[in-house]
Amino acid sequence: MFIGMKSSSQLRQEALEYTYNANTPLKIYLKVCVSILDKAQLEFQKGDIFSAYVLYYRYADLIANKLSDHSELALVAERDQTVLHREEYYQLVKLELPAVLKIVEDLQKNIDLDYNKIQLSLSKNIAKQQKKPNHVSEPVLLPKTFNENRFNQSISFFNNMNSNITLENKMHGNNNNNTHQELLYPELPTLSNASYI
């Protein structure tokens, strides 16, 4: 039974989702209580504190809230079996229930601490994602002296020169990196409003 990351209040709601029938004999519910407690301890030993919390809480609710009103507890002892089951119930209330309530309390603290850490981490991640600005490129204003045709010719010349150098190196088998080839860069526009001029 994997519960996942939920708050203790969500887990409590889940723990209370079970069917109780007041007409079911007390001895059956006592066996159910022992079974729930065994499963809770097994889940706790496996490290699944969420499932363990649900089962321990369900056990405590069944013992303290549901079975306390069971009709066999109110009957005057007519049979030895009824007396035996009643005594077993009162032993559970006296001996096991306080220990289980302490376990529930400790597990609740751990679950709430983990849940709050995860919620804080998630909220920080969401805040980081919202803070990232959308990079919208603004149009670049070119200086009035910029000549687009001349710039494109320079780029074309540069590309042709580089392809010619690469072709010559391949033809002559000259792959030596020590050979110095002069590279020509395109002429860039002069900025008239530059602050460093």
Swiss-Prot record:
Major location category of this protein: other
A Pfam family of this chain: USP8_dimer
Key words, A-Z: Endosome, Protease inhibitor, Thiol protease inhibitor
One Gene Ontology molecular-function label: cysteine-type endopeptidase inhibitor activity
Localisation: Endosome
GO cellular component: endosome
Leader peptide range in chain numbering: none
Cited function: Inhibitor of the DOA4 deubiquitinase involved in the regulation of protein degradation by the proteasome and maintenance of a normal level of free ubiquitin.
Name of the protein this chain belongs to: Regulator of free ubiquitin chains 1
Biological source species: Vanderwaltozyma polyspora (strain ATCC 22028 / DSM 70294 / BCRC 21397 / CBS 2163 / NBRC 10782 / NRRL Y-8283 / UCD 57-17) (Kluyveromyces polysporus)
